[in-house]
Curated annotation (Swiss-Prot):
Keywords, sorted A to Z: ATP-binding, Cytoplasm, DNA-binding, Isomerase, Magnesium, Metal-binding, Nucleotide-binding, Topoisomerase
Coiled coil: none
Family recorded in the similarity comment: Belongs to the type II topoisomerase GyrB family.
NCBIfam families: gyrB (TIGR01059), PRK05644.1 (NF004189), PRK14939.1 (NF011501)
GO cellular component: a single term: cytoplasm
Binding residue positions for Mg(2+) 2: 495, 497
Molecular function terms from GO: ATP binding; DNA binding; DNA topoisomerase type II (double strand cut, ATP-hydrolyzing) activity; metal ion binding
Name of the molecule in the record: DNA gyrase subunit B
Catalytic activity: ATP-dependent breakage, passage and rejoining of double-stranded DNA
Amino acid sequence: MNYVASNIQVLKGLEAVRKRPGMYIGSVSINGLHHLVYEVVDNSIDEALAGFCDRIDVIINLDNTITVIDNGRGIPTDIHEEEGISALELVLTKLHSGGKFNKGTYKVSGGLHGVGISVVNALSSFLEVYVNRDGKIFRQTFSKGIPTSKVEVVGESSVTGTKVTFLADSEIFETLDYNFDVLEKRLKELAFLNDKIYISIEDKRIGKEKSSKFYFEGGIKSFVDYLTNDSKAFQSEPYYIDGFINDVIVNVGLKWTESYSDNILSFVNNINTREGGTHVMGFRSGLTKAMNEAFKNSKISKKDIPNLTGDDFKEGLTAVISVKVPEPQFEGQTKSKLGNSEIRKIVEVVVYEHLLEIINLNPLEIDTILGKAIKAARAREAARKARESERKKNAFESLALPGKLADCTSKNPLEREIYIVEGDSAGGSAKMGRNRFFQAILPLWGKMLNVEKTREDKVITNDKLIPIIASLGAGVGKTFDITKLRYHKIIIMADADVDGSHIRTLLLAFFFRYMRDLIENGYIYIAMPPLYKIKYDNRIYYFYEEKEKEKFLDSIETKNRNSISLQRYKGLGEMNPTQLWETTMDPARRKMRLMNIDDAIEAEKIFVTLMGDLVEPRKEFIEQNALNVINLDV
């Protein structure tokens, strides 16, 4: 298929982009800055999906410009008949002017192709593009979306491809400081989803020099292996499904582990569909249908076994679903949920038919997986009975709030906050030091449950977790309803030592598995009590970081240092109620860390590594991150 100027169609102009950048890239924060890089890379990925590109290089240059190079066909440079300008200039200056809008050019497209690169141009103070095509090297430059040069031939070339260099506009973006790790993770994800494509990233900034290269022969199978390499698996390698119906390509990798939770990632045209959609619904129904058939035909005794559901078959399952759809319909501006109704049946048929073949070829492994599903079904029944029993006793309702909870008087969830505090002594100080109008205190005691190693029926009846579930008032697991939440700030307050860190991680794992909406909606915080108290010159100073304390000490003349009194806080219990209020609980002065899931894939891996059964991966992770553990955000 030829890719020339006539393939480029124009829908409308670029005027609004600089006025309302958030409508096109989500925000003007660092997330929007990274979005510019993704849009340019997505154009190169489109060439790869069409079979014309197998290498993409991304460079963060010394001056904070970004360069993206691919070996695709090169953007067309001939004159567009309708517009009377070169296709290259058209693609970079007109919104909705890309090969994506002509079905013959790209059957499927990630990113916005045309929308994306023109938006990048509009939001860059400088953009330069080189095109290797038709034996020549073409060049054109732009500023804030406006051409500053004509398309000119600057040399000869025996290869094809496109090189884009841009400088994001400092008048629009809050920062131009790219985060290498964030970009690296996205490029690694793209390399997993598009097998046999070489993708590299290099940071040339002084003091930040590093680079990574990705190439995965196994594609999605490699992705599943990466996600499960810290878990005990039932299979020697992932099962792989590859099929297509009506130009829709379906690729799925599956692997069952001994975990009690599932991890299903879904993508449409390389876009992470975090909210799922019709492709995920089709996967679940195809999986359930095939596995029920496998159970029916197996020699496993059917006596006293509850009906097996999709949730039972999903226990311990890690799956990556990737579909390529010619005309995807995404619900919402963020492209996080697929809406095409026809995709559900297509994915269901492909998954069902291919999974039946896999089942026939792997009878022993499938029997083991079915055995796990049966245990999950029995645990599900036990959890249902436990819920009903607890419901009858009002254990999860506000009428039966735990005795240790010191509640606040405000009835407005928007202003109410609850401190979940490690230890009775610290809980006592917190109760006395708090503002009783809007601050509630729930002390924790004893050993906290590790939910990564526990089935749901044991979780919802655990005597350490029931007080948390009851206090929050919104249910747990599948019955969790965030609209019933009694507090809009949930603050974990624990000692700044190894035990405190362990308790924080256990609580975060519980919220991640059973109340993930709390993290995704920004309701979970970590309290940051001070590490040091210094008395000097009749004044008291509190310091929350080692470097803050050192900077303060360095500012004091040597002759006066004998008059300094320094205390290192080992635990919350060392502070009296007034000190705890002033340093850790007063909204005007306290420091807290908001927990969020910028990267759900990495969050999943971290919890499995830290809380799972395998010791070696946990040891490696701790050794690699020991120096950064205070800054570990999940």
